[in-house]
UniProtKB/Swiss-Prot annotation:
GO biological process, one term: tRNA pseudouridine synthesis
Keyword line: Isomerase, tRNA processing
This protein's name: tRNA pseudouridine synthase A
Catalytic reaction annotation: uridine(38/39/40) in tRNA = pseudouridine(38/39/40) in tRNA
Top-level taxon: Bacteria
Length: 246
């Protein structure tokens, strides 16, 4: 059975998340319905990251097995047509070896979080970014973020519902950059814990508005206690940016 790698973009606002659930429509469900509309078969799709409700993607990756070969461009265009009007699109499709797995073959995941830092309400970016009125110091946020880079026990920065066997992860990079009224926080690692990036962002926002210092971030990390975390940032501003493979 030929296997295809799909690079997918979506607006997570109307969905309960990536994974198929019984309480609402998911991105996975829309894709599987689109594939069925194209080929008439119920095929299972496997994603690289299980994004939560309201979280977006510019570079989610998934794989799917077809019973017979299909031209990748035909697959992309036909499934996209069947997914309308849902805000989900296959940007690229390519045939890959059977050994490729979207989740387990990934070597790095890149997430971006967008903060719009201004007094005026959001219009075009409503549901696509976190609006923060109080002026944030992006340089202080970037400096504090470096305390979270490396191999650590991230118990403080994971959801109490996180099902990962270990809270230990290696974060390769966190950068905080300001572009006019927008602050972008980019986090890179092989994998992340549930709510880890949003927990980072909520904590770094506290540094940006002067409520926390880098030292307090360091103490929160060392505490290995969820109660020591800052507020969790809303899902609106989070994007699965890219997934890397060898």
């Amino acid at each position: 059975m030929p296997r295809y790698k799909l690079t997918i973009e979506y607006d997570g606002s109307p969905f309960v998340g990536w994974q198929a659930q019984t309480n609402g429509r998911s991105v996975q469900q829309v894709l599987e319905e689109g594939i069925k509309g194209f080929c008439g078969q119920e095929l299972k799709i496997f994603g690289a990251g299980r994004t939560d409700a309201g979280v977006h993607a510019l570079g989610q990756v998934a794989h799917v097995d077809f019973e017979t070969p299909v031209a990748p461009d035909t697959l992309r265009d036909a499934v996209n047509a069947h997914m309308r009007p849902h805000p989900v699109a296959i940007v690229e499709a390519e045939e890959v070896p059977d050994s490729f797995e979207a989740r387990f073959s990934a070597v790095k995941r890149h997430y971006m979080y967008r903060i719009v830092n201004r007094r005026a309400p959001l219009t075009l970016d409503r549901g696509q970014a976190w609006l923060v009125h109080k002026t944030l110091d992006a340089d202080a946020m970037h400096d504090a973020a470096q305390a979270l880079v490396g191999n650590h026990d991230f118990t403080t920065f994971r959801s109490v519902q996180c099902q990962a066997k270990s809270p230990v992860k290696t974060v390769d990079e966190i950068s905080v950059s300001r572009y006019a009224d927008e602050i972008e926080i980019v986090c890179r690692a092989r994998s992340f814990l549930h709510n880890q990036v949003r927990s980072f962002v909520g904590t770094l926002k506290m540094v940006g508005d002067g409520s926390w210092t880098r030292r307090k971030v360091e103490k929160a990390l060392a505490a290995k206690d969820r109660a020591a975390c800052g507020p969790v940032a809303p899902p609106d501003g989070l994007y699965l940016l890219q997934v890397d493979y060898e």
